[in-house]
């Protein structure tokens, strides 16, 4: 779990590097930090933009627009990035896990959404990723 948490923090750092906001102390910068921190801790739960905006006291459209302006990434994609990175760790760490179990443990409620997001973000299906990971481990051993 610590390794996964560390890896997810690296993702967060990469998103921050790509961000184009003037100051982390700006209102939107602080909001962004709060949102990313919350997502990094709760991505396996059912999080919606509406619930997140209510939690932080913002209009959902404003929150969505601010995140996209600061990062170039929409809320749903940011959430999917965290979930897919976690799923990749589950796949490589637990090759016997079924793809559907991996999807559910990563926070996805629908296997189709998981498969589509996984392919969009990695360029391969979860099964292909598992096969490639297994082949890479075999060639190292």
Residue locations for each model-derived region?
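Short, Lys/Arg-enriched, Trp-marked, Pro/Gly-tolerant hinge/linker segments that flank
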Residues: 1-4, 12-37, 41, 45, ...
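Short, solvent-exposed alpha-helical "recognition" segments
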Residues: 73-75, 123-126
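Core residues of bacterial helix-turn-helix
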Residues: 55-56, 67, 106-107, 118
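Terminal helix-turn-helix DNA-binding modules in bacterial transcription factors
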Residues: 37, 41, 46, 69-111, ...
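Short hydrophobic/aromatic patch on the recognition helix
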Residues: 62-63, 67, 71, 113-114, ...
């Amino acid at each position: 779990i610590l390794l996964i948490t560390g890896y997810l923090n690296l993702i967060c750092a990469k998103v921050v590097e790509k961000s184009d906001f003037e100051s982390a102390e700006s209102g939107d910068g602080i909001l962004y930090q709060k949102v990313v921190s919350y997502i990094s801790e709760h991505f396996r739960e059912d999080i919606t933009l509406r619930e997140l905006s209510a939690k932080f006291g913002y209009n959902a459209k404003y929150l969505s627009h601010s995140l996209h302006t600061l990062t170039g990434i929409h809320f749903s994609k940011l959430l999917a990035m965290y979930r897919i990175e976690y799923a990749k760790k589950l796949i490589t760490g637990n090759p016997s896990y079924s793809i559907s179990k991996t999807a559910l443990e990563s926070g996805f409620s629908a296997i189709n959404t998981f498969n589509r997001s996984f392919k969009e973000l990695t360029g391969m299906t979860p099964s292909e990723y598992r096969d490639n990971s297994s082949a890479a481990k075999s060639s190292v051993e």
